Design a protein with these regions (language model features):
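Polytopic transmembrane helical bundles with strong interfacial aromatic enrichment
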Residues: 1-131
Length: 131
């Protein structure tokens, strides 16, 4: 019973994280004056920090749901990439080239999040995720 609930929490959180990354891209676009944005990046920054809870729930759901080790590992990788993502802008003053990796890391984060979400959905449907 707990494992089934954990797997459902895992899949829902994974898809919410995918949606959150897409919302983040939109909020970043709203902050760019070149695209007509006037609000700055405050919403992008605040929302970016708030989704840490979702990425942590992905891992918790995988653990409670007794997901395969590979799925747990991918969930940990999401957390690592998330913390890299939130750290990259702080390199702006000392290393702008490193800070410029922020959008590229966001793409990696989105790809991995989709992969984790698809595999999570297969877990709840009873189909073994591909290795």
């Amino acid at each position: 019973m707990a494992a089934t609930l954990g797997r459902w929490i895992h899949v829902v959180a994974a898809w919410l994280f995918v949606l959150a990354i897409i919302v983040q891209a939109y909020l970043a676009g709203q902050g760019l004056p070149q695209l007509g944005g006037t609000s700055g990046f405050e919403a992008h920054i605040a929302f970016g920090y708030s989704i840490v809870l979702v990425v942590l729930v992905i891992l918790i759901g995988a653990l409670v749901g007794r997901a395969p080790r590979s799925q747990v590992g991918l969930s940990v990788a999401l957390i690592v990439l998330y913390f890299v993502q939130t750290s990259l802008p702080y390199a702006k003053a000392s290393s702008p080239a490193i800070a410029a990796l922020h959008p590229a890391n966001a793409m990696l984060l989105l790809i991995l999040a989709i992969y984790v979400a698809v595999r999570a959905r297969r877990l709840v449907s009873g189909v073994a995720p591909a290795a």
